[in-house]
Each structure stands twice: as C-alpha cells, then as structure tokens.
C-alpha cells in the first residue's frame, strides 16, 4: 500500500467478506486518510476512484468479466497492485472459483499479492500463479502480531490455569493426566468447568474470550 501511494498508482484490496471489507475500510481511513480510501461491496460504493479501494473478491472478479482476457479496462486504470486477502478461500467448494478466476483473468501487468495464514500447499499455489498469471515469489514468515500462548486448565482444586509449555518450549511437568471421572455403570458424561474457566480468565485479565465447544450438550 505504501508503495502504491509513493508511486502515485492505485491498489485494490480484496477480502472474502463484506464485514471484513468494512473493517479494513475504517482501519485504512484512519491510517491513510479518508480521501485516499474507497469501498466497493454488493450494496456500497464509497470513493470508488480512490488510490486504495477495498472490495469483496466477487466485486473484483466481476470487474474482470467486463474486460477482454488480459486487457485493462477503465475500472482497472492506474491499478498496479491487487491484494487477495484470505486466498485460502480458493479451496471453498462454493466460492473457490472466484479466487481462481480473479488470478487467471487479472492483467499480467498488475502485481498480485496473495495473503493467507492457513495455506498448506503454498509452494504448489505459488507455482500455479506463476503459470497462469506472472512470475511469483513465495514469502514465508512465522511472525505473529499477536503471539499465541497456550494454557491448561487444572480441574483439581484450587482451579487454576497452567502454562502448557515452559519458556524453552517443553511440556510443563506440573501438568498431570486427569483421572477418569466415570466407572462402569455410572454416567459417562465428562464434567465441565465452564464457570471456573471463565472465572480464571477474568482473574488473569484475559477477557474477552471465545469459548469453543465441539457439542451443544
């Protein structure tokens, strides 16, 4: 984005979700100034001629539908970069073709920056983009803006959260396997500690949080 602004050209930033596009729009307006940022979704059009335009990937793909293969239409004039955020959506059964077509039909003079934190076959994807679009380089990083920290909830009283790993990356030896909570002929449902876990999170200033469970029961 900074390169586009310095070069005086335009950049499209695509996302798979309207909500994510809206969030990026507000973030970029705050960072770069509202006069430099536009938004295009299915039902919203704001400053569409801006240097930085955020849109859903479907909107970008539909722009390409109206041009000859490899050509640059008026709506792509001065566009030098296209960011495809969450490019792993290419594996989605219903919507994956949107990302494929966006890459295939994108003019080769436009540089594609494909972003994802979850693509497993990144080398294969790089080679494919290199074949159907233009020369492509894979850039890997293990940097996380928000570092992951793992904890284990000790259900023996007093209830507490224990670091899963030691500072050198080894399993915390204070964590012991839980004993089975049921015996033959008794209720086999495992006791849950939702309230105790949330209380521990609150006590350690770790809220808000998302509590994920595999069952509604």
Segments predicted by a language model, with ranges:
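Conserved nucleic-acid-binding Ia/Ib motif block in the N-terminal RecA-like helicase ATPase lobe
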Residues: 9-65, 127-130, 137
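Conserved interdomain linker/interface between the two RecA-like ATPase lobes of SF2 helicase motors
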Residues: 104, 111-113, 118-217
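SF2 helicase catalytic motif II
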Residues: 53, 57-61, 68-114
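Well-ordered alpha-helical segments embedded in enzymatic catalytic cores
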Residues: 27, 59, 98-101, 193-197
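Short, glycine/charged-enriched secondary-structure capping and boundary segments
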Residues: 26-30, 67-71, 96-100, 127-130, ...
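Walker A/P-loop NTP-binding motif
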Residues: 1-9, 27-29, 100-106
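Loop/turn-to-beta-strand initiation segments
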Residues: 9-11, 36, 49-53, 78-81, ...
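A short beta-strand-to-loop transition that corresponds to the Sensor-1 phosphate-sensing loop
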Residues: 17, 55-59, 86, 116-119, ...
């Amino acid at each position: 984005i900074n390169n586009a602004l310095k070069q005086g050209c335009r950049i499209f930033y695509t996302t798979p979700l309207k909500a994510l596009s809206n969030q990026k729009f507000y973030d970029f307006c705050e960072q770069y100034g509202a006069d430099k940022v536009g938004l295009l979704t299915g039902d919203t059009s704001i400053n569409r001629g801006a240097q930085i335009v955020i849109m859903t990937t479907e909107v970008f793909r539909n722009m390409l539908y109206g041009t000859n293969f490899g050509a640059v239409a008026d709506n792509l004039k001065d566009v030098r970069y296209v960011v495809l955020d969450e490019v792993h959506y290419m594996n989605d059964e219903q919507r994956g073709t949107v990302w494929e077509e966006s890459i295939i039909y994108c003019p080769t003079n436009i540089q594609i920056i494909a972003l994802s934190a979850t693509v497993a076959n990144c080398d294969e994807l790089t080679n494919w983009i290199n074949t159907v679009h233009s020369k492509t380089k894979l850039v890997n990083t293990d940097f996380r803006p928000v570092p992951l920290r793992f904890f284990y909830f000790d259900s023996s009283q007093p209830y507490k959260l224990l670091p899963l790993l030691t500072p050198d990356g080894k399993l915390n030896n204070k964590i012991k396997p839980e004993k089975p909570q049921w015996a033959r002929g008794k209720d086999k449902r495992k006791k849950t500690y939702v309230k105790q876990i949330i209380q521990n999170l609150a006590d350690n200033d770790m809220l808000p949080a998302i509590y994920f469970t595999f069952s509604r029961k």
